[in-house]
Amino acid sequence: MSGQFTSQAAQRPRSATILIVEDDMDIGVFLQQAIDEETPYQTTVVSDGPHALEKAQQLHPCLLLLDYRLPGMNGLEIYDRLQQMEETRGIPAIMMSAHLPIEELKPRGIYPLYKPMDIGNVIRMITHALAPFEQKRSPESAWIV
């Protein structure tokens, strides 16, 4: 497994990047295609923690979509490491798994997303998680005092 791939749809000019961290490439491709089709966001998929840390520093994504159970380091460990770095601190995150440690997600402000996933719920969760980001980017918000 190469550790990362980017869809052709993600190569067109888009507004911002969602970093998907998922070791099951079938799920990664499914999420990437759905997000590319249903949102204005570019997506990049990586399959493990080291690639996630590297790509997050390079891309400065607007959102992290993290699988909880990953080889080597879990999604929470990735999130915590990114929060320790100034350039990636504060990136909102959605954590995916069949079994999530809700008591650890809540204090971090991480949104829970249970597998198996309904793509409609995934898109709604992304929209909700990115509402503050979109509000800041909106030209109208520059005029709000």
Model-derived regions: residue spans:
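Hydrophobic/aromatic residues positioned on beta-strands within the core alpha/beta folds
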Residues: 94-96
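Acidic catalytic/metal-coordinating carboxylates
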Residues: 48, 74-80
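Non-catalytic signal-transmission and effector/linker regions of two-component phosphorelay proteins
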Residues: 1-19, 120-145
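Acidic, metal-coordinating helix/loop segments flanking the phosphotransfer/catalytic sites
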Residues: 45-63
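Active-site residues of response regulator receiver
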Residues: 66-67
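The feature encodes the CheY-like receiver
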Residues: 71, 89
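A Lys-centered signature of the CheY-like receiver
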Residues: 115
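Two-component/phosphorelay signaling modules centered on CheY-like receiver
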Residues: 24-44
